[in-house]
Regions:
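Short, small-residue-biased leader/transition segments that mark boundaries at the very start
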Residues: 1-6
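Key DNA-contact positions within bacterial/archaeal DNA-binding proteins
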Residues: 9
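Basic amphipathic alpha-helical segments that dock to polyanions
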Residues: 17-18
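Glycine-centered, phosphate/nucleic-acid-interacting loop/turn motifs that mediate DNA/RNA or nucleotide
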Residues: 22
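Short beta-strand "wing" residues that participate in macromolecule-binding interfaces
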Residues: 26
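Amphipathic alpha-helical effector-binding/dimerization core
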Residues: 29-130
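Extended hydrophobic
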Residues: 140-212
Length: 226
């Protein structure tokens, strides 16, 4: 009996907390609970991104076949990127630690830098200032001036690199997926162990990656101008 009381109290605390955060609502007349607006918003958010993955899937699979490297698709969520799709590369027995649903800061990832390069400079600076900037590895860019020189370089090249800035032993090349305004909320990347990802290999991957970003942008109704 004591166990049942404890369970009811725990459930009540959880429901109260969820009510305060808008995930559920309590009907004052019936005392019954139903889904709140926050939960509905989350459902819509998930469905929207499933749609993006569905539209991008064929291009991502083609990119994986062309390069035999690990392919990622991410979306921006405020100061972070969230991984929403991954295709493991067949070119290495080593598997990236990345996983669908993983969240990382914009500033220390190739995909994040690619996305920030499509933003107005004032917005990119606001993201930097709001981020808890620290060195994930010895290669993470933590100096503000150096970071914005890097963003300017990404704008000029049309792609971004992650030189072991987030994960030691892994190098990435990334490209943003711009919408019709030229702004990006999604990006793709190719990742491989640093030992195989020399500059020459980066240049080999650049063409397939940029073609894929253009094709996904077109599939999503965005820009195809790069």
């Amino acid at each position: 009996a004591a166990s049942d009381v404890y369970k009811r109290q725990t459930v009540h605390r959880l429901l109260t907390s969820m009510c305060m955060r808008g995930y559920v609502q309590r009907d004052a007349e019936t005392s019954m609970y139903r889904a709140g607006m926050r939960l509905c918003e989350m459902s819509s958010y998930i469905v929207d991104n499933l749609d993006v993955v569905d539209r991008a899937r064929a291009v991502l699979e083609r990119l994986g076949r062309e390069t035999d490297e690990t392919v990622h698709l991410v979306m921006r969520d405020e100061r972070d990127v969230v991984y929403i799709h991954k295709i493991d590369g067949g070119n290495s027995a080593i598997r990236m630690f990345s996983r669908i649903g993983m969240r990382l800061p914009l500033y220390c990832t190739g995909v994040g830098k690619g996305i920030l390069a499509t933003c107005p400079r004032s917005e990119a600076r606001a993201v930097w200032e709001a981020s808890d900037v620290y060195a994930w590895t010895e290669n993470t860019i933590t100096d503000e001036e150096a970071f914005f020189r890097e963003i300017d370089k990404v704008r000029q090249l049309g792609y971004a690199l992650d030189n072991e800035e987030n994960e030691v032993g892994v190098r990435c090349i990334a490209a943003a997926i711009p919408d019709y305004r030229g702004r990006a909320f999604y990006a793709i990347s190719l990742s491989a162990p640093t030992a195989r990802m020399a500059d020459e290999r980066i240049m080999q991957l650049r063409g397939p990656l940029l073609r894929a970003s253009r094709d996904i942008a077109q599939a999503l109704g965005g820009s195809t101008g790069r």
